[in-house]
């Protein structure tokens, strides 16, 4: 067996002795016994560092120098081979090699994979956009909810002269009270052909996986699709400023108000539950309860009912030592019972103020300030009365 130049401590050994030294070391013979047997002047702890390396009869692909093969781990079976490496550039014939050559190869491979992934994502963005025809109508053709959502998105995302918008997450004001309402409104605007995902979006904002094309509505950049997209924004603002609404908007106002009120109440309900470590899974039961409260209470008054319901659920958790899911369900009923008690005894329910941790959404600003011009009355006045008046 041919060895690379050996350490001075074992230079006195011939080829056969080196073979015997390697065999003894690999077989697991103690370092002290090996040192004594082969008369090596070295500390036992340094024995591995001076063991001879064999020429591997291979040329390094990185630098062209001859490679050597190290020893396998002590006690390894006979078919286990040592790692082949280059003594000049430290390249190893392993998947774990991180020499400069391998790092460059990995970087090139990752860059190629990234380019392929980005190309596929752009294809998916184009295909997604082409699923829905471009909006060709005017403001008069828009339902009130669509007009409010469109203007709110434009105010959050600040489209430029090319109608390219910033991501929703860049806005200091949230688009909608809840993620659910935001996603529903964004999806609705996409299906109407008013907006589409821009191929200028960050690569991290979307991906292709087993579910197909998946994107984060908060992180992608949006493109206004209508040729007069910015003109539509101005037309909606003008309709709100002058009060010259499409006839249908007046009929739809109470329903849109109710939708925003429900979202704001649900946002506060989830906030109170989260503060107490509750996770309510019964979306239907929560929606039924909030709908009942909003029949004669404002959002601000519902905040008070929800707060007392959350406090009662926390007390119930301590008193009964029940599970948190049980207490979370109790919270729903506690909110309803508090509201029923308030109605039965004709309480003057003092409204809460907005929660500092739950800032007013852009949809609320557009609906109540720009279109309806009632400001925070959308928060402090009962929507149920308007619903009954419009029925």
Residues covered by each model-derived region:
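Short, solvent-exposed alpha-helical "recognition" segments
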Residues: 15, 43-61
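Basic, amphipathic alpha-helix used for nucleic-acid engagement in HTH/winged-helix/SANT-Myb modules
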Residues: 1-15, 54, 116-136, 236-247, ...
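Cys/His-enriched microdomains
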Residues: 55-61, 65, 84-87, 97
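Cys/His-rich microdomains that often coordinate metals
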Residues: 64-68, 93, 106
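Cysteine-rich micro-motifs
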Residues: 73-101
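Basic, alpha-helical nucleic-acid-binding regions used in initiation and control of genome expression
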Residues: 29, 74, 78-81, 133-391
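Short, basic interhelical loop/turn and adjoining N-cap
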Residues: 32-49, 177-181
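Short, amphipathic alpha-helical "recognition" segments used to contact nucleic acids or chromatin
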Residues: 9-29
């Amino acid at each position: 067996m041919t060895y690379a130049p050996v350490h001075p401590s074992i230079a006195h050994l011939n080829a056969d002795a080196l073979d015997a030294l390697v065999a003894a070391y690999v077989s697991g013979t103690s370092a002290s016994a090996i040192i004594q047997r082969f008369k090596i002047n070295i500390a036992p702890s340094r024995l591995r560092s001076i063991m001879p390396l064999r020429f591997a009869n291979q040329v390094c692909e990185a630098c062209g120098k001859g490679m050597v093969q190290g020893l396998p781990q002590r006690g390894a079976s006979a078919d286990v081979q040592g790692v082949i490496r280059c003594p000049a550039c430290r390249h190893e014939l392993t998947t774990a090699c991180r020499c400069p050559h391998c790092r460059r190869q990995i970087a090139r491979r990752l860059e190629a994979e990234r380019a392929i992934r980005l190309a596929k994502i752009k294809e998916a963005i184009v295909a997604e956009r082409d699923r829905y025809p471009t909006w060709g109508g005017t403001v008069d053709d828009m339902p009130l909810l669509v007009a409010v959502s469109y203007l709110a998105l434009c105010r959050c995302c600040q489209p430029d002269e090319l109608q390219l918008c910033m991501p929703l997450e860049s806005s200091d004001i949230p688009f909608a009270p809840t993620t659910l309402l935001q996603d529903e409104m964004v999806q609705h605007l996409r299906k109407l052909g008013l907006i589409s995902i821009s191929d200028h979006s960050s690569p991290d904002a979307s991906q292709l996986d087993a579910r197909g094309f998946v994107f984060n509505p908060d992180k992608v950049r949006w493109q206004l699709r209508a040729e007069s997209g910015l003109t539509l924004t101005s037309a909606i603002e003008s309709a709100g400023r002058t009060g010259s609404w499409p006839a249908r908007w007046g009929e739809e106002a109470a329903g849109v108000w109710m939708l925003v009120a429900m979202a704001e109440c649900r946002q506060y309900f989830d906030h109170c539950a989260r503060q107490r470590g509750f996770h309510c899974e019964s979306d239907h039961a929560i929606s039924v309860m909030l709908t009942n409260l909003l029949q004669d209470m404002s959002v601000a008054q519902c905040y008070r009912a929800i707060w007392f319901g959350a406090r009662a659920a926390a007390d119930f958790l301590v008193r009964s030592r029940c599970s948190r899911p049980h207490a979370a369900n109790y919270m729903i009923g506690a909110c309803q019972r508090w509201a029923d008690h308030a109605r039965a005894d004709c309480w003057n329910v003092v409204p809460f103020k907005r929660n500092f941790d739950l800032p007013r959404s852009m949809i609320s600003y557009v609906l109540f300030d720009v279109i309806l011009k009632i400001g925070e009355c959308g928060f402090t006045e009962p929507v149920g009365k308007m619903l009954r008046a419009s029925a």
